[in-house]
Amino acid sequence: MDLYEYQARDLFEKYGVPVLPGIVADTPEEVRAAAEKLGGVNVVKAQVKTGGRGKVGGVKVAKNPDEAEEAAKAILGLDIKGHVVRRVMVSGGARIAREFYFSVLLDRANRSYLSLTSVEGGMEIEQLAVEKPEALARIGVDPIAGVDTTKATEIARAAGFPEELVSKVADVFVKLYDVYKGEDATLVEVNPLVLTEEGEVIALDGKVTLDENAGFRHPEHEELEDKAAADPLEAKAKEADLNYVKLDGQVGIIGNGAGLVMSTLDVVAYAGERHKGVKPANFLDIGGGASAEVMAAGLDVILNDPQVKSVFVNVFGGITACDAVANGIVKALEILGGDANKPLVVRLDGNNVEEGRRILTDANHPLVTLALTMDEGADKAAELAAK
């Protein structure tokens, strides 16, 4: 789960990372009040879960409350890479002498953690990695040993920090790692980490991604989820405990097992090239227990997507036999009734497949078409979606 900047800032403050004062606001009037409370020069920053805000007018400096209110009027409602700004943070200003970069993230390839650090912060890290890879220090972090003062000092020196700053930035690195470890994050990033003209080291902007698989250890993280901004279909699927990701196509996909669903997406995309370029509309993995209720919940989510024109149900019977899946589909269609109004192509294979096909054939539902192979099913679903 990606956090907004203000949420990351609050976590930083919790762990003792030096940050500027900040107040969240939803209206220009609230922004004015926040600027009056903070006093001095402030920065009004769009709260969206994407980068590049400053390049499109999502970050504005305000010298007084009037300017802060006007900045909010310009920023609120702004579309930044598909993210509509509904909230801003009014942050205190800082006189910046230098900008740095620091992050710690999950290194999946090496089954470890990795710190990325540079004395050239402020620019996008992807751009820095391409244009000046030598300016980015990559230091592995042992998940058991973590980042203590000794390790943080090693990181700071490897990145080329001036010796007089090493102890200061090392202290901040330790605290940022504490955020990473303590909150079960997969990414903690500060860009920029700044040195002010007064000699302070401050996290000026922050990005945090939390591991949702560790949510059982952090019930408080549920409060960080922005349900209002979530895709309504994804929110509905989450309530039903379904593994669903919305895409931009026209063929709804239901399968059991992430590998099979991913393969189905590829086959449907390939078939769509022959049928007006239609594409998969979603990823939906119903898992091993394809009960009537689970199937109904999955179909309910997909059929409520106005972009979906057809649905491809692709199931390989294993622990859950194909006859149980077929009964689930029939009962799901009964449960949904008139809400089931788009054609379904069903491909079953594996355990008890013949009985599963017989059940669907005997049901003779007008919306259901049986396919013997995945390729055949994908082609038929793409054809129906293209009509």
From Swiss-Prot:
Its EC number is 6.2.1.5. One of its GO terms (biological process) is succinyl-CoA metabolic process. The keyword rRNA-binding does not apply. It comes from the Bacteria. GO terms for cellular component: cytosol; succinate-CoA ligase complex. One of its GO terms (molecular function) is ATP binding. It catalyses: succinate + ATP + CoA = succinyl-CoA + ADP + phosphate; GTP + succinate + CoA = succinyl-CoA + GDP + phosphate. Binds 1 Mg(2+) ion per subunit. Substrate binds at N256, G318, I319, T320. It is an enzyme of class 6 (ligase). It holds the Pfam family Ligase_CoA. Residues 9-236 form the ATP-grasp domain. The keyword Membrane does not apply. Transmembrane segments: none annotated. Mg(2+) binds at N191, D205. Coiled coil: none annotated. Heterotetramer of two alpha and two beta subunits. Belongs to the succinate/malate CoA ligase beta subunit family. This is Succinate--CoA ligase [ADP-forming] subunit beta. The lineage of its organism: Bacteria, Bacillati, Actinomycetota, Actinomycetes, Micrococcales.
